[in-house]
């Protein structure tokens, strides 16, 4: 069963300021938590299109929401293709779009997917099981320099060089095939005092490899710009991020699209192309409540930002 505890459920959906007869997009269907709450607020004229790369998530949602008929449409695709996939089904603008980034609990909890450092499993980490690049390819084929770069940039790992050296030396004799092998190499690359602080020692490197395998940051940046274009005036975009890299992209994109650039003084009117596209609904991110954190430990790093199309 595809179960998943949804983070910031009410805040994210209510933040879209739902119109009962509106058209909405859930870019990250997952276990269907946000979709379920959103669908419950729509009348017969309303519609929800949900994206996911995971076939299991799609099939589960089709069963779960079958009573909604044509009001609920699933799209098995990476949300980087948001605009073109919506256009394929005749939709050119929508009333709201939400993103819940990060790995859903079922993916983390399914050992053979290779996302978790708590289970020994083949090195995979693909959100889309049909995609060609796997974590095995990254760990065994990418150069020392490439590994250092992704561990540092995507994982913000202080010991990137030491860990990459351990990987490089190990794979000269044998391929690194499982998450368990990789965890041990990461531990060897981190000094003992540092291993005892800041959560699981493999957390940052696993995050970095997952981001690289799925090209997550570039995909999100492109999709967020696309979402801003597709939302109608008065429509909103809600984004939940789970680490500083995603949050920085969201914050920067929202800020750039909600500020007027420096223009020559004395202009009688601001030309349309320089008018801000967005109004910020959240100046600072919304964080999970203490009650939510008690119930769902995975919510601890979540941040929600919301913007409205002008």
Swiss-Prot record:
It holds the Pfam family Methyltransf_5. Signal peptide: none annotated. S-adenosyl-L-methionine binds at residues 32-34, 52, 79, 100, 107. GO terms for biological process: rRNA base methylation. Belongs to the methyltransferase superfamily. RsmH family. HAMAP family: 16SrRNA_methyltr_H. This is Ribosomal RNA small subunit methyltransferase H. It comes from Bacillus cereus (strain B4264). The lineage of its organism: Bacteria, Bacillati, Bacillota, Bacilli, Bacillales. The gene is rsmH.
């Amino acid at each position: 069963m595809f179960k998943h505890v949804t983070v910031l459920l009410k805040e994210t959906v209510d933040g879209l300021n739902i119109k009962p007869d509106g058209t909405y997009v859930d870019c990250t269907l997952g276990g269907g938590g946000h979709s379920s709450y959103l669908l419950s607020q729509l009348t017969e004229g309303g519609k929800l299109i949900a994206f996911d790369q995971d076939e299991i998530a799609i099939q589960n949602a089709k069963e779960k929401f079958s009573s909604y008929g044509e009001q609920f449409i699933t799209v098995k695709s990476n949300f980087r293709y948001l605009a073109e996939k919506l256009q394929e089904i005749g939709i050119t603008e929508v009333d709201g779009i939400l993103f819940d980034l990060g790995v859903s609990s079922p993916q983390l909890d399914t050992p053979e997917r290779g996302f978790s450092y708590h289970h020994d499993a083949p090195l995979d980490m693909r959100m889309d099981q049909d995609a060609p690049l796997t974590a095995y390819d990254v760990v065994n084929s990418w150069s020392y320099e490439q590994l250092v770069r992704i561990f540092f940039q995507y994982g913000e790992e202080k010991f990137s060089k030491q860990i990459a050296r351990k990987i490089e030396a190990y794979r000269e004799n044998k391929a690194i095939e499982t998450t368990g092998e990789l965890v041990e190499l990461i531990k060897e690359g981190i000094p003992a005092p540092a291993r005892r602080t800041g959560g699981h020692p493999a957390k940052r490197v696993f995050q970095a490899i997952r981001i690289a395998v799925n090209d997550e940051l570039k995909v999100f940046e492109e999709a967020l710009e696309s979402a801003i274009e597709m939302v109608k005036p008065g429509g909103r975009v809600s984004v939940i991020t789970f680490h500083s890299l995603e949050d920085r992209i969201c914050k920067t994109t929202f800020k750039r699209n909600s500020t007027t650039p420096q223009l020559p003084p004395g202009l009688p009117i601001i030309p349309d192309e320089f008018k801000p596209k967005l109004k910020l609904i959240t100046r600072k991110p919304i964080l999970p409540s203490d009650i939510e954190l008690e119930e769902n430990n995975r919510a601890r790093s979540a941040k929600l930002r919301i913007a409205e199309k002008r």
